[in-house]
Amino acid sequence: MNTKGKIAGIISNLVIVEVDGPVSQNEICYIKTSDVKLMAEVIRIGGKNAYIQVFESTRGLKTGVEVEFTGHMLEATLGPGILSKNFDGLQHDLDKMEGIFLKKGDYTPALEDDKIWVFKPLANPGDEVIAGSWLGEVKENWIPHKIMVPFNFKGI
């Protein structure tokens, strides 16, 4: 079960959250408002409080609002299709956004899940692989993207 918390204080885009369990430095969390989820990152921990930086406007937030921690750090998604995109610092696809400013709570996936890519295997059935081993490759235009065993891979 993920750690949860409630907003105890707000100073601009710094939000103080009283947490009910463990959180980590740089962990991602979401503030759940009535209509959107706002992404934030833990920048400091002190006692039962996590100090989080919200990546967009905190206007309208109130104390007592629920915050859910993901257990994950801020991560970049890598894979075929990424080189032809325009991203901001949180890997929002700016070409899919409408208008000059991002809508509050609006997020786009970094990669298109429904796009089909031709996979060329580099590993053979029965090969022993470890985290980081190349399994195959996928070409995006003329650039081959190596597909690797995930770094959190455990087991056979």
Tell me what each language-model feature is.
Residues 1-156:
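Peripheral, non-AAA+ core regions of ATP-driven protein-machinery
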